[in-house]
Amino acid sequence: MLDLKLLQKNPEVVAKALAMRHSDIDIATFTTLDTRRRALLTEVESLKSERNKASAEVAKAKRAGEDASALIERLGGVSERIKALDLEAEAVKSEQNDWMLTIPNIPHESVPEGRDENDNVEVLRWGTPRAFSFTPREHWDIGVALGGLDFERAGKLAGSRFTVYWKWAARLERALANYFLDTHISANGYTEVLPPFMVNRKTMTGTGQLPKFEEDLFRLESWDYFLIPTAEVPLTNLHADEILEEGDLPLGYTAQTPCFRSEAGSYGKDTRGLIRQHQFTKVEMVRFAHPERSFDELERMRGHAEALLQNLGLPYRVITLCSGDMGFSATKTYDLEVWLPGQDKYREISSCSNCGDFQARRANIRFRPAGGGKPEFVHTLNGSGLAVGRTLVAVLENYQQEDGSVIVPEVLRPYMGGLERITA
């Protein structure tokens, strides 16, 4: 959520940000509501002053033994009017708040302006894509041929965009997740968390999934709970309605969870394989930072994700998302895209974002300055570290051999019982 004072004092800043995001939201709606709310509050204050004056006149008349019935009647009318205006002001405030919940974050000044993914800016590339002496296959062909990925039985169990992992594939998925977690905990200083995989509506609102993106979520209607689309949701909201100590910042949490997404609007995209699933595993990184240091933390978090890819020997590139392609809650986002030789292109495997105080305002997460003073909103950051299924895809495609086998990257072998090569 944006700062109310910014909307009131500098609506042109917000209007410019919305234009950069190519949003059709009209800032005039807020201005109209805010003007109406202020007018109601002014009228209420005026009537309260009138009520106080009338109360004093009633008391004076009673002390003098005079008839105060007319004054009392007038006082009752003023009180009823105040009550009605208070209710109207609350209704306008609620409508204003609902409107504010639909407004995306303001892009940071370093974010390139653009409409969509075609306007994103490449920052760097790491690693050289392998030159194959044969035509590289796509991961679903490799996984099925080696008996590890079973899309047919998954379809029988749950329908499209689900997968059953067998034997080495199940172990490789687990190995990747454990390697990611161990690295984040031991090398990067994150605290591991195992959060609920279902959350309530308030929690989804805190990180920005609601109210605008409900169609992308799986909802348990009888409880009005939602399956998490990412561990960012529960991890960020761990400190909702709390005041942290400045000396404890930055805080870093990591979690391995299943993620559930309806993939609304993705009809016909990535219909084969593991790239776009209704359920997938991801290891998430979340950080709470001091406002003055949050962009340093973004670079650090991006480095944590990059190091995993480098240790796995997977070529990748880093992209800065343009203003029109960023997520709703982000003020700046880097995407890491891994090279997939079977598809002959880079595909997203991690997204690292600084959300500024946007989520903290929605979830009411603040910190108390070390020197005293009024609590301030923290800055929240989140990043994939990494998407496990997509990393498995990258391992299969980059380490495939002409005989159909797949070499296991060295860093994963301790997690695979020393296995060096996957064969049928």
Swiss-Prot record:
Entry annotated with the keyword Protein biosynthesis: yes
Residue numbers binding L-serine: 230-232, 284, 384
Pathway involvement of the protein, from the record: Aminoacyl-tRNA biosynthesis; selenocysteinyl-tRNA(Sec) biosynthesis; L-seryl-tRNA(Sec) from L-serine and tRNA(Sec): step 1/1
InterPro entries in the record: aa-tRNA-synt_IIb (IPR002314), aa-tRNA-synth_II (IPR006195), aa-tRNA-synth_II/BPL/LPL (IPR045864), Ser-tRNA-ligase_type_1 (IPR002317), Ser-tRNA-synth_1_N (IPR015866), SerRS_1_N_sf (IPR042103), SerRS_core (IPR033729), tRNA-bd_arm (IPR010978)
Enzyme class name: ligase
A Gene Ontology term for the protein's cellular component: cytoplasm
Entry's family note: Belongs to the class-II aminoacyl-tRNA synthetase family. Type-1 seryl-tRNA synthetase subfamily.
Record text about domains: Consists of two distinct domains, a catalytic core and a N-terminal extension that is involved in tRNA binding.
Protein name stated in the entry: Serine--tRNA ligase
Organism expressing this protein natively: Nitratidesulfovibrio vulgaris (strain ATCC 29579 / DSM 644 / CCUG 34227 / NCIMB 8303 / VKM B-1760 / Hildenborough)
